[in-house]
């Protein structure tokens, strides 16, 4: 636990607006969850009624929002310390901790039950596990206890495309596993790049990020190693029926750029990084978001083109 002077049980006088309660759901994170889940659902080799697909994505989004609310409730004591998170609704006093907890628990139950009714029990079970893993295993345990928090905890963010696939097909396949693995392996370089230029925030909050426990030099090496391990996963998807030339070309370009970025980070020393205010690290972090989005966009584009009859590869 952090030494921050924040009590989750304390009453707060501020009345939150709709925007404050919506912010509890972490809409930016939710948008990535929704998109990757949508891709997982649409690239699946089955015919799905549009209403079933809509309901599946809606309830996956609700589940993601529930996870965000539970995370904000639990992390309020460290969020109040970190500049990047101090303005969140709970530490800012706009929403009471108990309200965030109630919203998170309520939406968790609703999303799991409704996804089971709309699709199948396996998809609902995966959603329930994802919420539990993020809110309990990652937020309450891993995040504050080990520098491997992001490595293990990254599984929570990697499940959405698998849930989308299972919602459509009712089973797990190699394609679903590789989409999961793509996000899972991408997560450490993405967040460690952030930690390179936000080290002081994590240190002050008592979060044992790799930069805090092992230093920036070790973190740079870890970023390069995990990026190298990420490349075959990304390219491996091109060998499955859901991908084709478009995805392969996209993946080759993106991974070449990503590898170059990781190499540039590894070569830098702290004097260089401080001199340009971590410009290379910030650029790598921003590109990592585009990297993931474009991989899934390429998968989605191939699925749409194939089903429309305009594309003869993949699918």
Curated annotation (Swiss-Prot):
GO terms for molecular function: protoheme IX farnesyltransferase activity. One of its GO terms (biological process) is heme O biosynthetic process. PROSITE patterns: UBIA. The keyword Transport does not apply. It is an enzyme of class 2 (transferase). GO terms for cellular component: plasma membrane. The chain crosses the membrane at residues 21-41, 52-74, 98-118, 121-141, 150-170, 177-197, 223-243, 246-266, 284-304. Its EC number is 2.5.1.141. The keyword Membrane applies. It catalyses: heme b + (2E,6E)-farnesyl diphosphate + H2O = Fe(II)-heme o + diphosphate. Keywords: Cell inner membrane, Cell membrane, Heme biosynthesis, Membrane, Transferase, Transmembrane, Transmembrane helix. Pathway: Porphyrin-containing compound metabolism; heme O biosynthesis; heme O from protoheme: step 1/1. NCBIfam families: cyoE_ctaB (TIGR01473), PRK04375.1-2 (NF003349). Interacts with CtaA. Converts heme B (protoheme IX) to heme O by substitution of the vinyl group on carbon 2 of heme B porphyrin ring with a hydroxyethyl farnesyl side group. Carbon 2 of the heme B porphyrin ring is defined according to the Fischer nomenclature. PANTHER family: 4-HYDROXYBENZOATE SOLANESYLTRANSFERASE, PROTOHEME IX FARNESYLTRANSFERASE, MITOCHONDRIAL. Belongs to the UbiA prenyltransferase family. Protoheme IX farnesyltransferase subfamily. This is Protoheme IX farnesyltransferase. It comes from Dinoroseobacter shibae (strain DSM 16493 / NCIMB 14021 / DFL 12).
């Amino acid at each position: 636990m952090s030494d921050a002077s924040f009590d989750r049980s304390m009453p707060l006088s501020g009345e939150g607006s709709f925007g404050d309660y919506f912010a509890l759901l972490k809409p930016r994170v939710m948008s990535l969850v929704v998109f990757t889940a949508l891709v997982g659902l649409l690239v699946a080799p089955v015919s799905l009624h549009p209403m079933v697909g809509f309901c599946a994505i809606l309830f996956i989004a609700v589940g993601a929002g529930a996870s965000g609310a539970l995370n904000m409730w639990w992390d309020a004591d460290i969020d109040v310390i970190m500049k990047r998170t101090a303005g969140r609704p709970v530490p800012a006093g706009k929403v009471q901790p108990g309200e965030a907890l109630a919203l998170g628990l309520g939406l968790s139950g609703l999303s799991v039950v409704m996804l089971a009714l709309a699709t199948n029990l396996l998809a609902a079970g995966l959603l329930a596990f994802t919420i539990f893993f993020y809110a309990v295993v990652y937020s309450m345990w891993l995040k504050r206890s080990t520098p491997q928090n992001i490595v293990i905890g990254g599984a929570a963010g990697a499940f959405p495309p698998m849930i989308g696939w299972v919602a459509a097909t009712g089973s797990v396949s190699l394609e679903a596993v590789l989409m999961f693995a793509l996000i899972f392996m991408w997560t450490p370089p993405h967040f460690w790049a952030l930690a390179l230029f936000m080290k002081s925030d994590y240190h002050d909050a008592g979060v044992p990020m790799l930069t805090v426990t092992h230093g920036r030099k070790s973190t740079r090496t870890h970023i390069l190693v995990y990026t190298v391990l990420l490349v075959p996963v990304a390219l491996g998807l091109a060998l499955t029926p859901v991908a084709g030339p478009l995805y392969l070309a996209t993946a080759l370009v993106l991974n070449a750029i990503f590898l170059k970025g990781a190499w540039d980070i590894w070569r830098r020393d702290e004097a260089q990084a401080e001199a340009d205010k971590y410009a290379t690290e910030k650029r790598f972090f921003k590109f990592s978001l585009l990297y993931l989005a474009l991989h899934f966009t390429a998968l989605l584009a191939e699925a749409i083109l194939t089903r429309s009859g305009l594309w003869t590869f993949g699918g």
